[in-house]
Swiss-Prot record:
Family the entry assigns: Belongs to the AKAP110 family.
Biased composition (Low complexity): 1492-1504
Region described as PKA-RII subunit binding domain: spans on this chain: 910-927
Any one Gene Ontology cellular component term annotated for this protein: Z disc
Keyword Cytoplasm: yes
Assembly and binders: Interacts (via the PKA-RII subunit binding domain) with the RI subunit of PKA. Interacts with SPHK1; the interaction greatly reduces SPHK1 activity.
Record field: compositional bias (Basic and acidic residues): 1469-1490
Protein name per the record: A-kinase anchor protein SPHKAP
Length: 1683
């Protein structure tokens, strides 16, 4: 290769493209980036284990589709992505043609693609190239400059052979996700700073570049000539960290772009190594060395797959800057000028070599004169290299996928002649050259610099090491992202490198020469660690020659030894000893050969156990005494000697005492189980297409077991060392005994808190024994945690290893708990833990762990307790450990669980957790109760905490629980008999698994079930009973029966008065499922009215904040019920929630009159009387009034019962998401149709302007990411906030709102009372004011959002019902809408539609409102920005001038949307209504679906305005147009009714509201909108996860007829929606079927389809397509037909 080509190897980073995919894409980025314009190539491999790979996830995806826009080909003001589809049907296609096509995209493309052709991207792979020159212009990172994007994604269409496979579709979506996300990130980077990566490393790119440039100047002299000759630009191959900035799992497969690219694109270039983080460097070294070593493009270069790959990018040869090199390297290492080629191979092998060596200062020291190796000199060595590489490749890939990477600190470099400079090492360390066939020495160097960066992620000892600046940046990223590399991995890498270098003679020769010149030894102090120079050693061996086979054998041996000893890794890291400087001693090579021969000749004779034992002993020695060997040579000698010795005594190996054997078996079982689980998981996660070979399985198992054993050894020895060390203080035995005694005492006294006790003991012990109590007890509270785990969980980040180790040492539990996330720390002791380790990145959820734990417990340590006891008697360390271990295993039941939980969540999180639990439970319960109208008791499937995995609910368990009650109840609504505490306990006892699961929820050691005061339990039961009796539950079931309605009313009223206000109001629930909303909403509203109607108001009032009461009650409940009985808590919370919900619904249900508060309401006394009471009374009155109205109420009730959609089918199991919503995981969503969460009070207050509660399903947008059950709660802000909101915001705001409302009610209420419909005459202004307040206040909190949605519906309703009375219409509308509930996503806000009462159907129809929602969503999204959005809305409203001026100002203030609503004329309303009706018709049959469009204009005006306040500015008419427009316009809110997107959409749509005016204006509007949208997007909070930026998607096909353009566009639409991109644009010229696409978009918005709906439709289409083959309509046509 040309000497000039410069390779900068960068760490692979995996970016979590999807919020969902925690490890969905393992991305190996091999990028080449040159300083000036570098091309970055990053290959991402989609992994099947990603959430995004889950069909369920997509089918249940509730995100709102983003908007679609089309732009003229010229427009370039938008970030863009080009998806290049490399699929070609016939290879016969003229290559030149294809090449030309690629050149059109970018002149760089053909070269890059050719270089990749060796390994064409597979279906699950996507290659991201950025920095390519644009086809017609200079590529510039400035997107506006580049017609193509900075990111060109090369995708091989996955649809080729399996066009109909769902997996294919998902893969495609994920590819698009990756591409789009990369562009988003790039935009962010560009905006924030291109140097972010460097910022991380604390060195700016420029500074690094300068350093390198300086260094390179020296090289330039040599290189320039060559460069000129070659005329090639050097390609900077550096993984663009910027690009792949997100460090993810270290496990990434990479392509060796650099290999191929280097070969192809770079051709001959000098590869300058950029210093990579050592970890990475090693890999990259191997990869690059091998890759670069190959002068040819041999596929063998594949090592590229190694995680670290280098991508080649072009850069002027003169550009020698090593952006990635960090200054530190400059300081510490001397710049080695390695002959380009030799270095190439060497460097690639060293990865870091040159960089390390490239310290500018040193650079002069190194001879620049090294002659470059001739490219032509490649010899048979290449063949060997390729062979070796291919052989090693699989291992590397496997390793990269499954194991953490090496600790950055210790870079183990095996390089030819150890030329490899350890990354921290000076090049001076370079070894003397050997002949090419001579086996290279292994140089293990600890990079002092690298260690710094790695510290947090890597082993605790790191802190001791210095990290060179160069490594840090990348390093830190990598290290932080990935666990340290396993020894095996390192060994393999070394072996591969060695083999590669060995096989490449030229490189070796070169290297030899260089080494000779550089023989000078260099001692480097890494943090005071001295590395002894061993360079001369190499010289001696250089004379020896090895045959390739022997070399391989030798290398294998060395690798094995190294792997076993873990020299390269942990020991060094842990002890911060620098075995790293173990350079091979002169004898090393001989040893190697001897070992090789020994192995080859005697391996059959040696007892396997003997060899294993010998290696193990060496490993233990190394671990226990890191300084035992001064060099690898010594180690090898020792290993050799030991193997021979042990072989002779094989027979003695198995003599173990019985107890030890038992323990060994136990551990063996645990480890094996864990390994198998891991393997299983891997298999599952592996790409479906990958085949499983038995050999691979065995390898994987071995690998897993080795890792576990290694970890166990490391921990054991580390701890042993600590104990021994500590033993100097209190005697070891004493300490151990002391710890044990204390632990045992604790455990005996409190079995459940055993872990806890132990932790304390350990802490004490640490304090006594450890001179460094600060370390040992660094985090006492953690120590207290049952498992010191939390304390240790930081381990990789880390406490001093000693600190962690000590307590863990003392207490295995700690060990087990150590760091489940860090595979290094996982102990095989605990199966559950192991499982965790398997997940590494993810802790298994507690429940899972629990179950596993139990299994392991049963299978493994049935007698753990006994062992434990035995152990107590023993004083020696081993026994202590055993006992501890046993204890660990044994205790699983509570202490372990608790411990686990605490490990995962610190005690500090308990309160938060509790709150979350309460909230989520309440929501869930309400949902379940609603679901269980048949008297089933809500048994919750435990939601496993920890990883936020859904624990599969115990279906049988739940069904059993429910069955009992089912049998008697039938469909009629029966009172739900609340389970008594005793009953719950009994059931829990009967179903231990259930109990266990329940216990996962809230476990506070401090709680004692026994303390439950009777009064509390009584109250709880009472509340539960009342709640259970509430109609909601039964009604929501969707089995609404008229009789049940009446009955419900009676029951409801009764209950209401009896229920304590606090309990009733306790938790408002929000529904995350928009669809569910529709149904449940309607039901709920219906239910609620009857419920409240019959009752008397509860007299429990007290101005005391409901919040206080509620929170007190809940806390009490929790404390009392405690632990395993969260069930009760759930019950109560649920009941409270449901009651609140009921009340809210009732309000909503009080159809038109809701809003009109009658003077009779106690509103005036709000200050003194409990707001709750007033609220209820008020509701009751409304109900009564409605009853009087008769026709209305009857109609409404009828509508409710008949017209309500039955709740959408619920998944049989209700998954309770721990209150942590996992927006990503489909499971996280409760499938249960959440009852509409009326923010009971919140909604009420917000809607109070309308005087009706908006029982609006929370807008999809906000909730989309949340679990259905909890989403409402979470939607708004996230767990913490949720809790806050629940208790404080919700209550406070609702109370406040209620008070205001009451006042309002007092003023206007009388009027309202006078005339339920029209009476509200004066209320509008008040309502508006209130609404404004609510909007501004609540908007932020999220109620506003709800209101907005509801407003949309209501607005329609209001408009329709405007006739009745503009003022009253709002209230009417609200009820109607609620009934309509129709808008699954929309909240039907009673507030908005007084009219709704009249047109319940319409409210159903209001579905369309979702379009309006667009603006609403904006508000929601804007909640933070609500005010800004509102102004926009205001403008819209103004635009919609028709709205009554009087209302407009207020409305505008409160919500511009309201204005727009007002604005909409009756016609528009009618139209909209019709549309809505049509939409509703699908779901709703209400005859009333259309309310008379006759609603008076005035009513529409005032109401509309009011509605608009909450509704989107878009009026029904404008909105409808908008929706159409939005459909057509990418900018307009394509997802008006879609949740989150709505906001974005709103943002866009608001600006685009004018667009709504005419479709004709779409194009222009699109442009304007896109601009405005962009502006807004930037301003809008949008999704935190993704920048709200619009993207231009360009699709480029080598063969245009290949892909299904419509399908692709649809999938891209889905991907963009998933990422929260507000709008994606397509080039008009590319999207031939623009009109149809726009129609489809319009349809989707009209139908309020979510991403999941679109995905489902696509899947159906593909299936159909597969079946019919011919005559299938195009996707768009089919969708339109479907619609």
């Amino acid at each position: 290769m040309d000497v000039n080509s410069r390779l900068s190897v960068q760490s692979n980073v995996e970016s979590p493209l999807m919020p969902e995919d925690s490890e969905p894409q393992q991305i190996t980025s091999s990028a080449a980036g040159s300083l000036a314009g570098s091309i970055t190539a990053c290959k991402k491999v989609l992994r099947s284990n990603s959430l995004l790979e889950s069909t369920d996830y997509w089918l249940q995806n509730q995100r709102t589709p983003c908007q679609i826009g089309f732009v003229e080909d010229e427009s370039e003001n938008c970030a863009s992505v080009c998806f290049v589809n490399l699929d070609v049907n016939k290879d016969g296609c003229s290559t030149e043609n294809l090449q030309q096509k690629l050149v059109n995209v970018s002149p760089d493309l053909p070269k890059l693609i050719n270089s990749m052709n060796v390994q064409k991207p597979k279906e699950n792979e996507i290659v991201l190239l950025s920095g390519l020159a644009s086809g017609n212009r200079q590529a510039d990172f400035d997107v506006s400059q580049c017609p193509w994007l900075p990111d060109i994604c090369l995708v091989q269409c996955a649809r080729g052979n399996r066009p109909n496979s769902t997996n294919c579709i998902i893969f495609e979506i994920n590819k698009f996700l990756i591409g789009l996300e990369v562009v988003q990130e790039r935009q962010l980077h560009l905006e924030t700073s291109v140097l972010k990566l460097e910022d991380d490393t604390n060195c700016s790119l420029s500074s690094i570049e300068e350093d390198f440039l300086t260094a390179s100047e020296h090289l330039e002299e040599e290189i320039e000539v060559e460069d000129c000759k070659s005329g090639l630009e050097t390609i900077n191959v550096s993984a663009n960290v910027l690009e792949s900035k997100r460090p993810k799992e270290a496990t990434q497969e990479g392509w060796d772009y650099h290999k191929e690219i280097l070969h192809c694109a770079l051709g001959e270039k000098h590869i300058r190594k950029h210093r990579m983080p050592s970890m990475k460097t090693e890999r990259s070294k191997e990869n690059t060395a091998e890759n670069t070593a190959l002068q040819s493009l041999n596929p063998s270069a594949r090592p590229s797959r190694l995680k670290s790959e280098v991508a080649g990018s072009k850069q002027p040869a003169t550009n020698y800057s090593y952006p990635e090199n960090i200054r530190g390297e400059i300081e510490t290492s001397q710049m080695l000028f390695i002959p380009r080629d030799a270095y190439l191979s060497m460097v690639s092998s060293c990865g870091v070599l040159t960089e390390q060596g490239s310290n500018h200062r040193d650079h002069d020291a190194t001879p620049n004169s090294l002659p470059p190796v001739q490219n032509g000199e490649a010899t048979a060595g290449e063949y060997a290299t390729n062979l070796a590489e291919s052989v090693m490749q699989d291992a590397f890939i496997r390793l990269s996928q499954s194991q953490p990477t090496l600790p950055q600190e210790s870079a183990v470099s095996f390089s030819v002649g150890s030329a490899l400079l350890p990354s921290g090492c000076c090049t001076k360390d370079m070894v003397v050259p050997r002949s090419w066939n001579e086996l290279p020495k292994i140089v293990i160097v600890q990079s002092p610099e690298g260690s710094d960066t790695a510290p947090e992620p890597s082993v605790s000892s790191w802190p001791d090491l210095e990290v060179s600046v160069e490594t840090p940046g990348i390093f830190s990223e990598e290290s932080s992202s990935r666990p340290t590399q396993s020894a095996l991995e390192v060994a393999l890498a070394c072996a591969a490198t060695v083999i590669g270098t060995t096989s490449s003679p030229q490189a070796t020769e070169r290297f030899t020469m260089e080494q000779e010149s550089l023989v000078s030894t260099y001692t480097q102090r890494g943090n005071g660690i001295q590395q002894t120079p061993v360079p001369r050693v190499f010289m001696g061996p250089s004379t020896t020659e090895y045959s390739f086979p022997s070399a391989l054998c030798g290398m294998t041996q060395v690798a094995s030894a190294v792997a076993v000893c873990g020299l390269g890794e942990r020991e060094e890291v842990t002890y911060s000893v620098a075995p790293s400087d173990l350079l091979p001693t002169p004898g090393a090579s001989e040893e190697r050969s001897s070992i090789g021969s020994l192995v080859t000749e005697e391996s059959t004779e040696l007892g396997k156990e003997a060899i294993a034992e010998a290696l193990l002993r060496e490993a233990t020695l190394v671990l226990a005494r890191p300084n035992a060997y001064s060099s690898v040579g010594e180690l090898l000698e020792s290993v050799n000697r030991r193997i021979i010795e042990t072989t002779s005594k094989t027979q003695m190996l198995c003599t173990e005492n019985v107890r030890r054997n038992e323990l060994a078996h136990t551990l063996s079982n645990v480890i094996l189980k864990h390994s198998i689980d891991e393997l299983h998981q891997k298999n599952i996660m592996a790409h479906p297409t990958e085949e499983r070979h038995p050999g691979g399985t065995l390898n994987t198992l071995m690998e897993s077991v080795n890792q576990l054993l290694h970890n166990v050894m490391c921990f054991t020895f580390r701890k042993m060392n600590h104990i021994v060390t500590l033993g100097e203080h209190p005697s070891f035995d004493k300490a151990a005994g002391h710890a044990w005694v204390k632990a045992s005492a604790c455990s005996s006294s409190h079995p459940s808190s055993n872990a806890h006790g132990t932790g304390l003991v350990i802490r004490d012990l640490v304090e006594d024994a450890s001179p460094k109590p600060d370390k040992g007890g660094a985090r006492p509270e953690l120590v207290n945690n049952p498992r010191l785990q939390s304390e240790f969980s930081c381990s990789h980040r880390m406490l001093d290893s000693t600190a962690r180790t000590f307590p863990k040492e003392m207490y295995p539990k700690g060990i087990v708990g150590e760091d489940t996330r860090n595979p290094l720390h996982t102990l095989s002791y605990d199966s559950s833990e192991q499982r965790t380790s398997t997940d590494i990145g993810k802790l298994t959820t507690v429940g899972e762990v629990r179950s596993t734990f139990q299994e392991s417990e049963d299978s493994i340590v049935p007698k753990a307790q006994e062992k434990h006891t035995c152990a107590t008697t023993l004083n020696n360390e081993a026994q202590i450990n055993l006992s501890l271990l046993g204890d660990d295993l044994v205790v699983p039941d509570q202490s372990t669980l608790e411990a686990k939980q605490s490990e995962v969540y610190g005690i500090t999180n308990f309160a938060e957790e509790l709150a979350e639990t309460v909230v989520s439970m309440a929501t869930e319960i309400a949902a379940i109760c609603l679901d269980n109208s048949h008297g089933k008791q809500p048994w919750f499937c435990a939601w496993k905490r920890g990883n936020e995995f859904l624990m599969t609910p115990n279906a049988s368990c739940r069904s059993l629980k429910r069955k009992k009650e089912n049998s008697g109840t039938g469909s009629t609504v029966r009172k739900h008999k609340p389970p008594r505490l005793s009953e719950i306990k009994r059931k829990a006892d009967e179903h231990p698994e259930l109990k266990e699961k329940l216990m996962n929820r809230v476990m506070d050691e401090s709680m004692n079930l026994e303390d439950i005061p009777d009064s509390v339990s009584t109250f709880a039961n009472e509340v539960a009973a009342k709640i259970m009796n509430l109609t909601e539950f039964s009604t929501v079931d969707g089995v609404w029966q008229t009789q049940s309605c009446s009955r419900n009313r009676l029951l409801g009223g009764d209950r209401w008065n009896r229920l304590k206000a606090s309990s009733c109001e306790s938790i408002p629930e929000e529904d995350s499922e928009a669809r569910v909303f529709v149904n449940s909403l309607g039901l709920m509203s219906t239910l609620s009215q009857p419920v409240s109607r019959a009752s008397s108001v509860s007299k429990q009032s007290s101005c005391e904040s409901i919040t206080d009461e509620f929170s007190r009650f809940m806390v009490k409940q929790m404390e009392n019920e405690g632990r395993g009985f969260e069930l009760l808590l759930d019950y109560y919370a649920g009941k409270n929630a449901s009651s609140i919900l009921n009340s809210a619904i009732q309000q909503a249900c009080q159809k038109n009159d809701h809003l009109n508060v009658r003077p009779s309401c106690p509103s005036k006394q709000s200050s003194t009387e409990s707001i709750t009471e007033e609220f209820y009374k008020y509701m009751l009155r409304d109900i009564a009034k409605e009853n009087k109205d008769g026709a209305l109420s009857r109609r409404s009730s009828h509508d409710w019962s008949t017209g309500l959609l039955s709740p959408s089918a619920r998944s049989p199991l209700c998954y309770r998401q721990s209150s942590m919503p996992d927006s990503r995981s489909p499971c996280s969503r409760l499938t249960v149709n959440a009852p509409i969460k009326a923010n009971s009070l919140d909604g009420f207050a917000q809607n109070c302007p309308q005087d009706s509660i908006n029982v609006q399903p929370v807008s999809r947008a906000s909730s989309s990411g949340l679990c259905k059950s909890d989403s409402c709660l979470y939607r708004r802000s996230g767990t913490d906030q949720i809790t806050n909101m629940l208790i404080h915001e919700t209550w406070a705001s609702s109370i406040e709102a209620l008070m205001r409302k009451n006042k309002i009610i007092a003023d206007d209420g009388e009027a309202a009372n006078a005339s339920p419909g029209p009476v509200s005459g004066g209320s509008p202004s008040q309502v508006e004011k209130c609404a404004n307040r609510l909007v501004t206040g609540t908007g932020h909190k999220g109620p506003a959002l709800l209101v907005q949605e509801s407003v949309d519906y209501q607005r329609k309703d209001a408009v329709t019902e405007g006739n009745c009375s503009p003022v009253s219409s709002p209230s009417k509308m609200a009820p109607v809408k609620k009934p309509s509930g129709f808008d699954p996503t929309r909240e039907t806000s009673a507030c908005h539609n007084a009219v709704a009462l009249k047109s319940p159907r319409r409210s159903l129809c209001s579905r369309e409102v979702p379009l309006i929602q667009i603006e609403t969503d904006q508000k929601e999204e804007c909640v933070g920005e609500s005010e800004t959005l509102l102004p926009q809305s205001g403008s819209l409203e103004e635009a919609e001038g028709p709205q009554p001026e009087e209302t407009i100002p207020d409305v505008a203030r409160s919500e511009d949307t309201a204005l727009s609503a007002c604005q909409s004329s009756q016609d528009s309303l009618e139209t909209r209504e019709e549309l809505e009706v049509d939409v509703l018709k699908e779901d709703i049959t209400l005859d009333e679906s259309r309310n008379p469009p006759s609603s008076s204009e005035e009513s529409t005006g005032s109401w509309s305005q009011l509605a608009n306040e909450e509704d989107n500015p878009d009026d029904t008419s404008s909105f409808l147009q908008l929706s159409e427009r939005s459909m057509s316009n990418g900018n307009t809110s394509g997802t008006s009714s879609l949740g989150i997107m709505d906001l974005d959409i709103y943002q866009e749509s608001i600006p685009s509201s004018p667009m709504i005016n005419e479709l004709v204006e779409e194009k222009e509007i699109l442009k304007e909108q896109s601009e405005s949208v962009k502006e807004r997007a930037s301003g809008l909070p949008g999704r935190a996860a993704s920048p709200q930026r619009s993207l231009l998607v360009i699709n480029f096909d080598l063969e245009p007829e290949c892909p299904d353009a419509e399908l692709r566009a649809t999938l891209q639409w889905i991907a963009a929606s998933e990422l929260g991109i507000p709008t994606i644009y397509f080039k008009k010229s590319q999207e031939s079927r623009i009109e149809k696409f726009l129609d489809v978009v319009k349809l989707v918005h009209q139908k309020s389809w979510k991403v999941g709906d679109i995905f489902h439709a696509v899947v159906q289409y593909c299936k159909m397509h597969a079946e019919q083959k011919e005559g299938t309509p195009s996707l768009f046509d089919w969708l339109l037909e479907l619609g």
